[in-house]
C-alpha cells in the first residue's frame, strides 16, 4: 500500500467556537460589547488599558463559586449542569459545599415556610457580594403548589434574587444560560461599592 498525496497532508482540527447559538450560527456572546471593545483595543494597540474596578469585575465573573440549595426535582437538572455534557466549570462557575466560600446560591425547588428561615440563614452566611439564582417555577413563584398554605410564593420574598430561570423543571441549558446572564450582569453593574 502506497501513500497517496492526499493521505500525507496533516489533519487540522477546527478552532473551538464555544457555545454556538443555533438561530444565528455564531458563538454566544459574539455581539457582547464587552468583548467587542477588548478585541478592538487589542487589534489597535496590542495591549489593554483598564482600571482596577474593571479588572476585579472581570476576575469575579470568571471565578464564581456556587452553593446548591436543592429543594425538589429542579436539583436533578442543577446536577446535570456540572456533568461533562454541559461542564459549567469551563465558564469559571465551580460548586462549593460551604456558604462561607460561595458567591452564588442556586435555589432549586419548592421553598416551604418551614425552610425559609434556613434559606435566609445560609444567605446571610455568604460573603459580599453575593448573588441568587432562582431556578424553576416553584422557586420563582410557588409553582404547582402556589396555593398551598405551607409554600412560600417565590424565594424572592425571603432573599433578593438576581436571575430567574423559568421552567418546570428548567433544562440544564436554561440554567447555563442563567449563569451566563449573571456573569453579564456582574460585568455591567460591577462589584465594588463605594
UniProtKB/Swiss-Prot annotation:
The residue ranges crossing the membrane are: none
Q: Name one GO molecular function term.
A: quinone binding
> Where is the region Disordered?
1-26
One Pfam family matching this protein: Oxidored_q6
What name does UniProt use for this protein? NADH-quinone oxidoreductase subunit B
Q: How is the cofactor bound?
A: Binds 1 [4Fe-4S] cluster.
Instruction: Report the catalytic activity.
Output: a quinone + NADH + 5 H(+)(in) = a quinol + NAD(+) + 4 H(+)(out)
Query: Cellular component per GO?
Result: plasma membrane; respiratory chain complex I
Which subcellular locations apply to this protein? Cell inner membrane
The text of the family note is: Belongs to the complex I 20 kDa subunit family.
Summary of the function given for this chain in its UniProt record: NDH-1 shuttles electrons from NADH, via FMN and iron-sulfur (Fe-S) centers, to quinones in the respiratory chain. The immediate electron acceptor for the enzyme in this species is believed to be ubiquinone. Couples the redox reaction to proton translocation (for every two electrons transferred, four hydrogen ions are translocated across the cytoplasmic membrane), and thus conserves the redox energy in a proton gradient.
Q: Which EC main class describes this enzyme?
A: translocase
- Co-factor requirement: [4Fe-4S] cluster
Q: Where does [4Fe-4S] cluster bind?
A: 73-74, 138, 168
Q: How does it sit in the membrane?
A: Peripheral membrane protein
Protein keywords: 4Fe-4S, Cell inner membrane, Cell membrane, Iron, Iron-sulfur, Membrane, Metal-binding, NAD, Quinone, Translocase, Transport, Ubiquinone
Q: What is its EC number?
A: 7.1.1.-
InterPro entries in alphabetical order = NADH_UbQ_OxRdtase-like_20kDa (IPR006137), NADH_UQ_OxRdtase_20Kd_su (IPR006138)
Describe the protein's quaternary organization and the partners it interacts with: NDH-1 is composed of 14 different subunits. Subunits NuoB, C, D, E, F, and G constitute the peripheral sector of the complex.
One biological process GO term for this chain?
Answer: electron transport coupled proton transport
Organism name: Xanthobacter autotrophicus (strain ATCC BAA-1158 / Py2)
